[in-house]
């Protein structure tokens, strides 16, 4: 399937995390009572889609670059399925439909700039509206997708699976949204983890690329993820060539970040594996854990300047990991 602009929808968030909509007079906030109506008008999952992806970008990403990044990741995944479709036997076909979450993440490439965007990402979710808005979006997508296997899976009746993909600070926005849903009273994830009953939505997998958060974030900050509406694993990549979550994160938070050293402590055991080449299959046993830390130090190596390889995540190996998660979700 060839990619087109129609395969991607864009959600723009204001600095306070509220949803904006494009009008003849420019961007303006969507009234709270119109959130679900706006989702229905702009973000209804098409019946042809097999998988719904929600992508949140990271630090130093312009709106145009965010869209380019999503197209790049989808193109890599498409090329991989065409090159080796037998690698993903349950992805027949693979027809993704993507929602890109954009937010103001630009700053000076300095310690002060890093702290500024770190604080903004945190404030947008904890003091602002980002977690609520993204959580409502995920709930809408879940309610309107077709359920591939019946009640406890986050796939619609026609079999649509929901995957979250974040990069850098965008991972924080997604984690806060899922955590927000875990605290809500009333929906739910082919993994061994039981489907969480009574949740506002369920996610089939969460891929966090070079997450900008402390190594103990899942134990101390995103503590509700252990009981959140996740049917599949939380998978986080890391590379010791990532200076943003290594050098800058260490100076900003006095400790290395997940994107540099992997997941540390978490509410459940953490499985650590290496990132595989597109020609090597990921066994179900390698990914079927609540938390999986993926060492990409041999893959994410390109980059110069203050961030190092922080944004070297758009690689065939990343697409292979995403496709493997989608395949094992069936």
Language-model-derived ranges and their functions:
Residues 39-107:
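Short, surface-exposed "cap/lid" segments of acyl-processing enzymes
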Residues 130, 166, 170, 174:
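Gly/Ala-rich beta-loop-alpha elbow adjacent to hydrolase catalytic centers
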Residues 58-65, 122-126, 166:
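Extracytoplasmic/periplasmic, Sec-exported soluble proteins
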Residues 54-58, 167-168, 210:
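The conserved beta1-alpha1 loop
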Residues 65-68, 176, 220:
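Generic recognition of short, well-ordered alpha-helical segments
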Residues 32-40:
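Glycine-rich, highly charged phosphate/nucleotide-binding loops
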Residues 1-33, 91-97, 101-142, 147, ...:
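Lipolytic serine-hydrolase domain surface
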